[in-house]
Regions:
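Alpha/beta-hydrolase-fold enzymes
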Residues: 1-33, 39, 165-169, 187-293, ...
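Short, surface-exposed "cap/lid" segments of acyl-processing enzymes
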Residues: 45, 49-141
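Alpha/beta-hydrolase active-site loop
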Residues: 146-167
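Alpha/beta-hydrolase fold nucleophile elbow
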Residues: 163-180
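Short beta-strand immediately N-terminal to the catalytic nucleophile in serine-hydrolase-like folds
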Residues: 174-176, 206, 329
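Catalytic histidine neighborhood in serine/cysteine hydrolases
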Residues: 295, 345, 349-384
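Short beta-strand/loop motif that positions the catalytic acidic residue
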Residues: 322, 328-330, 334
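Conserved alpha/beta-hydrolase "acid-adjacent" motif
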Residues: 335-341
């Protein structure tokens, strides 16, 4: 039924009269006004998109990496075949002793958290006095054909160890966004199994799932036929990121596909510059082996929540061993990681937890700076078994949840140190390799 409903919705959206020039009054009017120039321009846009192999959503020439997007000052201080580690310049005289290591999803580019100075979570965190590090994952190529989930777990453990050693601290705060949050849960389970849980002071999960039993429309794309097709598309050892972009766009076809068909192909309108849509179209390739196992083992078979069903190397993964304090954020309108699916992490972690339901979805629900005064979030300090119970007793607070997170972080260590020595990128034992945002984020 779900597949029929999804297919029907897609068909109805595609066949909307607004999507055809002779049944859209606005297109007809503009065609008469311009003598058909709008259709000529639209055809040119369409041909350019066909050549690129991707539907455009914004003016791609309006942004330059490190200049007006991903521009928070910092240095790449470590590079491996899988990731670069970026350390950001402090802007305060004192910083919190416990640093923050952010793991963004490798399905997209890390700078979703550093779009511009007004929207940047990274810049905001630095301004709060947090020593901030982020991992920039390499977009997959043929050399990464054998990369599997174990490698990403090992990379997270390595990044945590690197920052601890660099700054001489006992532990770090961590953030995992989407698939990197799922991986962070596995990483914490591995550390717990190895009696190394003390390396992480806290874990924050942005729209991250561990139980995929109610993972939304993406569950419709993991049957044997779909997996076989994805395998065929990954013949060079990686999946071209444009396929993933098309998949995510199809989940909201009206907004992310047909809206641009009408405005740009039919109306001939110019593409407006929009940093979020630039990021959305800046795709990354995925290692084929990792992608196949991720869809099969997590989405289809839901193995992660069964203790011992999955391993990282020889270490069994058991989420119930995780005692690390956790801050769990979900988006009320998230169509990629539905809030009810994210909620399920509450049943598997055993340490203290705080759940926050943010207004909006998978991106805007996360990237919501306080200065914007947009949306809202809900909190509920009473114990709840279900998301419905949480919502029923929740308190709505206008604006961004970032301040709530900051207060929570301070509750897990508020001692400060001078922002000098190794707290300055390149001034510790790890020298600067290049300026942020680094070269990996620019690789296609």
């Amino acid at each position: 039924k779900a597949k029929i409903r999804f297919a029907t919705r897609g068909l109805v959206e595609a066949l909307s009269p607004a999507n055809f020039p002779f049944t859209n009054p606005q297109v007809l009017e503009k065609t008469l006004e311009t003598g058909g120039d709008n259709l000529v321009r639209g055809l040119q846009f369409m041909l350019e998109d066909i050549e690129r192999g991707q539907l455009r959503q914004t003016d791609t020439d309006a942004f330059e990496m490190g200049v007006n997007i991903a521009a928070t000052p910092g240095k790449v201080i470590k590079e491996t075949p899988l990731y670069q580690l970026i350390q950001y310049e402090p802007t305060t005289k004192k910083v919190f002793e416990t640093p923050l290591v952010i793991f963004p999803p490798w399905i997209n580019r890390f700078y979703i958290l550093d779009l511009n100075p007004q929207k940047s979570f990274i810049r905001w965190a630095v301004e709060q006095g947090i020593s901030t590090f982020i991992v920039s994952w390499k977009s997959a190529d043929a050399s990464m054909a054998d990369v599997v989930w174990d490698d990403y777990i090992a990379a997270q453990i390595d990044a945590i160890a690197t920052v601890r050693d660099l700054l001489g601290v006992e532990n770090v705060h961590t953030i995992g966004y989407c698939v990197a949050g799922t991986t962070l849960a596995a990483t914490l389970a591995v550390l717990a199994a190895q009696d190394a849980a003390q390396c992480v002071a806290s874990a924050t999960f942005f729209t991250a799932q561990v139980d995929f039993s109610e993972a939304g429309d993406l569950l419709l794309m993991v049957d044997d036929r779909q997996l076989a097709m994805i395998e065929q598309l990954s013949g060079d050892g990686f999946l071209d990121g444009r396929y993933m972009a098309a998949t995510f766009n199809s989940l909201r076809g009206r907004d992310l596909i047909w809206n641009y068909v009408v405005n740009n192909y039919l109306m001939g309108d110019d593409y407006p510059p929009f940093d979020l849509l630039y990021w959305n179209g800046d795709t990354t390739n995925l290692p084929a082996k990792w992608h196949q196992s991720y869809l099969r083992d997590l989405y289809r078979d839901n193995k992660l929540v069964v203790p011992g069903q999955m391993h990282a190397g020889s270490t069994p993964i058991d989420l119930t061993r995780i005692q690390t304090p956790a801050y769990i954020q979900a988006g009320r309108e998230d169509h990629i990681a539905p809030a009810n699916s994210v909620w399920k992490i509450m049943h598997h972690l055993r340490g203290p937890k705080r759940f926050v339901l943010a207004g909006s979805g998978h991106i805007a629900g996360v990237v919501n700076p306080p200065a914007a005064q947009k949306y809202q979030y809900w909190v509920n300090d009473a114990p709840c078994d279900t998301l419905d119970q949480f919502v029923a007793g929740a308190r709505e607070i206008k604006g961004s949840w970032w301040g709530d997170w900051l207060d929570w972080i301070k509750g897990h260590g508020d001692s400060t140190v001078a922002a000098k020595g190794a707290r300055i990128p390149g001034k510790g034992k790890l020298k600067a390799i290049e300026d942020a945002p680094g070269r990996y984020v620019k690789m296609r």
